[in-house]
């Protein structure tokens, strides 16, 4: 059978389409393929706890309710870290660890600079519990710094201390006892003095006694500490504390 010219052209077109059909990708996914995840339609999850800047416990003046507010604000690690972040206090959490049956770190971290103040801890970058870091930050901002300006007429540039974390027992006038110290949990700071911008150095060892401005300053911040820390011990307590204030951020209520 002879094909006319029009029929031959139609047949060629059909064959070309049939051959090219193999080059068109299949629109169906291969067997077993998983679809790409879709973008979330709601808001992304944020921090588990949020404290607005300037509204936390660290930015509130010390009063009769400070200790209770601190205990509430540091009831969980997340809440405590949020309080520090809101106040621009540098705190880097560290892993929990156990060094002995009575010594170790839980909910602790490294307290770095407080970006809202001038005073720096000396030595710096101190490992302590988050609760202690929050209490120290309240005391520094709301007591130590303003009291120095009011009584001594100069800014505090350094807060000196004798350490925080130490695996040992409680010390008294007779030496170390069998009772485990809060230092064994990094929950207590031994504060020894301050350095001022004008160059003066005020120490518990050298300036506690008397009624001069230096002694009044130290007693003022000790009295304020009693409303911030669960335990505050000074040279008035015993000879073992003749050169420092023992500041403990745990349950209890002892001020001497």
Model regions and ranges:
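Post-signal-peptide N-terminal segment of Sec-exported extracytoplasmic proteins
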Residues: 39-74, 79
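Active-site acidic/histidine clusters and adjacent loop/turn architecture
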Residues: 69-159
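Short Pro/Gly-enriched beta-strand edge/turn motifs at strand-loop
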Residues: 169-176
């Amino acid at each position: 059978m002879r094909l006319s010219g029009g029929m031959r052209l139609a047949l060629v077109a059909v064959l070309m389409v049939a051959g090219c059909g193999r080059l068109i990708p299949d629109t169906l996914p291969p067997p077993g393929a998983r679809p790409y995840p879709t973008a979330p339609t709601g808001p992304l999850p944020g921090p588990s706890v949020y404290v607005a800047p300037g509204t936390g416990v660290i930015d509130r003046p010390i009063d009769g309710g400070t200790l209770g507010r601190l205990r509430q604000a540091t009831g969980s690690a997340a809440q405590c870290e949020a309080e520090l972040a809101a106040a621009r206090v540098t705190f880097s959490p560290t892993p929990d660890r156990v060094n002995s049956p009575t010594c170790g770190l839980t909910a602790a971290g490294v307290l770095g600079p407080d970006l809202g103040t001038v005073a720096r801890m000396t030595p710096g970058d101190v490992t302590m519990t988050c609760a202690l870091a929050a209490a120290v930050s309240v005391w520094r901002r709301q007591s130590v710094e303003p009291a120095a300006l009011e009584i001594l007429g100069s800014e505090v540039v350094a807060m000196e201390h004798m350490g925080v974390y130490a695996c040992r027992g409680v010390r008294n006038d007779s030496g170390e006892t069998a009772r485990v110290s809060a230092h064994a949990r990094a929950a207590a700071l031994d504060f020894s003095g301050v350095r001022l911008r004008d160059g003066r150095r005020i120490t518990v060892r050298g300036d506690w006694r008397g009624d001069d401005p230096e002694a009044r300053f130290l007693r003022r911040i000790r009295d304020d500490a009693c409303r911030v820390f669960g335990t505050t011990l000074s040279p008035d307590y015993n000879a073992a504390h003749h050169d420092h204030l023992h500041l403990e951020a745990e349950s209890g209520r002892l001020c001497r």
